[in-house]
Amino acid sequence: MNNSINHKFHHISRAEYQELLAVSRGDAVADYIIDNVSILDLINGGEISGPIVIKGRYIAGVGAEYADAPALQRIDARGATAVPGFIDAHLHIESSMMTPVTFETATLPRGLTTVICDPHEIVNVMGEAGFAWFARCAEQARQNQYLQVSSCVPALEGCDVNGASFTLEQMLAWRDHPQVTGLAEMMDYPGVISGQNALLDKLDAFRHLTLDGHCPGLGGKELNAYITAGIENCHESYQLEEGRRKLQLGMSLMIREGSAARNLNALAPLINEFNSPQCMLCTDDRNPWEIAHEGHIDALIRRLIEQHNVPLHVAYRVASWSTARHFGLNHLDLLAPGKQADIVLLSDARKVTVQQVLVKGEPIDAQTLQAEESARLAQSAPPYGNTIARQPVSASDFALQFTPGKRYRVIDVIHNELITHSHSSVYSENGFDRDDVCFIAVLERYGQRLAPACGLLGGFGLNEGALAATVSHDSHNIVVIGRSAEEMALAVYQVIQDGGGLCVVRNGQVQSHLPLPIAGLMSTDTAQSLAEQIDALKAAARECGPLPDEPFIQMAFLSLPVIPALKLTSQGLFDGEKFVFTTLEVTE
């Protein structure tokens, strides 16, 4: 659907049009007029003089000709620069560990007026009930929360145990929902390339909407074939030439800067005046601590401007206009007549200092959002209930037998990247030939009573203790890493007792833990409380060694088989390049 309007998302009644036209002509009173404001021109560069005239949800007019127009209320912007509301092109709200309601409270005052969300984390745990809850939240949100229908539940068939399926029939039931913009990331790219009919059926069913991609490092004929199938974008690019080639072949590029996957520095040099309509910004996975201390899409814009010298109008273009056009949300692309009045007023456009936010023509008050959060969450009817069908384990469950002189595969972590390397290490009577090797295990949590799948992990920086979590993409089984089997067992016990969550164990004791009662993924605490708890968890984790910046988010991707190179699922070690299971011992 790239760059074509979809009228499904821009419904305005004839009566609304008549009222809007009357205000545009100067024959009727506006609801709001924003005075003393300049509008950043995302098309030509430079600025447009205000004011901005608003009627209902929409902009009725822009420019000096409305200086004396009547309004019920006038907003003095005090010389601010106005830009369209920011849009996150791809994210999983669950990865913030906030509910959609809390996420809105945390991000809307920062100018994030629209999100394109794939709720496949909760769908992997709870199936269609999880998607239905996200749809309810989207329907009642002030923020424009659009949904892509999760396409790969589980991420890769036959490679892991997850909590539910999401069939094509169930997917089709949501296709025409007013908040649905398309099909979420098609992660099984080998299946698409090989022409598997079940995957092509999904693509065909959503072809009139937007088809999201997922193809880290893909190139050559395989990339050509993937694009031939109709995939329109990718958020997994992590190399400059990879991103350039995808743009050359007609893909739109989502430049991701999350809490674990940090690709902005690698890809930002690609952005220019010519290709910026095909470039977007996304976070994918960003935790509440970073949102509170650094920001969300606003933080990405700031870095484009300050660190990569991207011109103002181009930086704000890729943060709004490009994404709106890509998803057919043309009513959100500009501050212009007839567009939805999603407006961010900036006291400093270069520093992205947000002064005030309006959504659907109404000013946003952060304190009101916070005061209403609890009631709005209850109104959404969250799917509470314990999703951990797993008994505690003992240290003996993590026992691995090693033979001196033999070589064993090691999952090698790359800090702040989702990809891993597949290396090996030789075992001797004194241990492995590298001192950074620790243990990793994945335990299915959906009642199948499988023994833990165990492996070796290098490069994570864990010198002592253990970390455990039920946030483990995409099936969200229990993942635990540690230096001792006893501490690993204790960490697993704690997250089971919490009904899901995160835990740090050191010196034989639980140092910090965070319960996540909704699907083992999300908390019902406020954003501020969550940020404080995350801070405590990270502080406890740092005592275990020089870990990645976001150890729990990095750990969560160690079991995702659709990202190279070596991962561990509940079924065993998986080669993410050959897409086959492999053995711990290197025999070839």
UniProtKB/Swiss-Prot annotation:
Catalytic activity: adenine + H2O + H(+) = hypoxanthine + NH4(+)
GO BP terms, alphabetized: adenine catabolic process
Keyword Nucleus listed: no
Source organism superkingdom: Bacteria
EC number of this enzyme: 3.5.4.2
CDD domains listed in its UniProt record: AdeC (cd01295)
GO MF annotations in UniProt: adenine deaminase activity
Record keywords, A-Z: Hydrolase, Manganese
Listed cofactors: Mn(2+)
Disulfide bridge partners, by residue number: none
The keyword Hydrolase appears for this protein: yes
Family annotation (InterPro entries): Adenine_deam, Adenine_deam_C, Amidohydro-rel, Metal-dep_hydrolase_composite, Metal_Hydrolase
Pfam families, per database record: Adenine_deam_C, Amidohydro_1
Family: Belongs to the metallo-dependent hydrolases superfamily. Adenine deaminase family.
Alphabetical list of NCBIfam families matching this protein: ade, PRK10027.1
Subunit structure of this chain's protein: Homodimer.
Record's protein name: Adenine deaminase
Organism of this sequence: Shigella boydii serotype 4 (strain Sb227)
Annotated gene: ade
